[in-house]
Amino acid sequence: MIAFLMGMFFSTQAADHVKGNGKLSTKKITIDDFNAIKFDGVIDFNYEQSESTPHIEITVDENLHPYVNIDIQDRVLTVGFKGAKVDHFTKFIFKTNSKWLKEVKASGNANFIANSPLKGDELKINARYSFFISSSKAIMEGTWLYGPK
């Protein structure tokens, strides 16, 4: 009986794991406006501050799109995987925009790429683990706050 229960436990756990198939695909959707971003894991997060309608462009292995979770609550955009444990993917790239940004919360081995100057009174960045910020432009007009989560 114990062996049967252990077998059921391990087979249930295995069913929750998924790996990318190596074939990248990109999907683009329109989203509600946000002013804060929260993400976790190995991700390249490209952000642009603009007046255009907010959208997200997601590039990931084609079989992983159903597990990508995008949620906006109280103007906080949360991005990650949901519904399965993703063990491996080829790339996980997000491109998005909003009118302004006041906070970034990142955890994991994340890259945050600012593709435009960020204008505002204050930008707060909370990061855990390995976090990299890059920009080819002047990144911030205003106050820049960086600290642990």
What is the role of each PLM region?
Residues M1-K149:
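Intrinsically disordered, low-complexity terminal regions
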